[in-house]
């Protein structure tokens, strides 16, 4: 449960300013997308034609901000960790799949992936090279 003191920094943050400035704000946006199995499970890449077959990705994005020329995906986290590296290592693969799924649905590119940590009371940008399709897991040693 979040208390008011945990919410104050959020409403003073750049994240909140971007939410207010977006042309469209999609909240709790469900999606289901068929992707090549090698993108869904990187370990399957290169393992015959099964790795090229479809794998379903289903989820709910906390917030998708749509601007005139780009989109951003925002994921809220209530984990207790106060270490940005923890969030990047734990959630880059998830946001990589979200980015891929929404790239197929939106008329503009997804150019920013952000986690807002209520424990840290701060936003953490996921470097796009970590979230590149099929690259993030290699960078993280997975």
Label every PLM stretch briefly:
Residues 1-142:
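Structural signature of nuclease core domains in nucleic-acid processing machines
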């Amino acid at each position: 449960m979040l208390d008011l003191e945990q919410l104050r920094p959020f409403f003073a943050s750049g994240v909140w300013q971007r939410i207010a400035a977006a042309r469209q704000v999609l909240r709790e946006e469900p999606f289901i997308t068929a992707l090549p199995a090698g993108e869904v499970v990187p370990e399957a890449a290169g393992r015959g034609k099964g790795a090229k077959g479809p794998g379903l990705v289903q989820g709910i994005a906390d917030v998708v901000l749509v601007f005139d020329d780009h989109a951003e995906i925002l994921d809220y986290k209530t984990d207790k960790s106060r270490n940005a590296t923890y969030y990047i290592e734990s959630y880059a693969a998830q946001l990589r799949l979200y980015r891929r799924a929404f790239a197929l649905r939106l008329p503009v590119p997804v150019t920013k992936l952000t986690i807002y940590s209520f424990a840290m009371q701060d936003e953490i940008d996921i470097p796009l090279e970590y979230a590149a399709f099929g690259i993030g897991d290699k960078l993280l040693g997975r």
